[in-house]
Amino acid sequence: ATAEVRDDIMDILNLRDPFVLTTGFDRENLYYAVKRPRDKYRELLSYLKEKEEKMPGSSGIIYCLSRKNVEEVCYQLREDGFSVTRYHAGLSDEERKENQEDFIYDRKQIMVATNAFGMGIDKPDVRFVVHYNMPKNMESYYQEAGRAGRDGEPAECILYYAPIDNRT
């Protein structure tokens, strides 16, 4: 978190002289890649199939910029046989809670979500985070990608880039 955000948290929680641990940005267990595929979905499908072959049952998060993208990607992955669920602000509280629990407790392997998903989520064994679209800013990207590999094991953070992303 930025210094301003840390100060806000301390003020809101009324913390007096807290111990604050600040670490660097480098997490050696995370592999970062930016890809510019001709067909994002085909690239994603290929990536997930390879992941399933090498590491069956791996958990992962796919971040999309819009609810519409979440719905499209989740539907297509389900049609292609993946254990997938979704999360965005357009779902009822009940469905969001159910889908979140399905992911956390490994009833579903893949969460397709907007940035509404993730705050307060601590699932240590997330093996990959894919950004299907460009995130809104670097801070969002770092926070979302940082949900991978919290158990210290190797994890991948993949960003799919397309020129159209600059306009969204």
Residue ranges and their predicted role:
Residues A1-T168:
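Helicase motor core with emphasis on the C-terminal RecA-like subdomain
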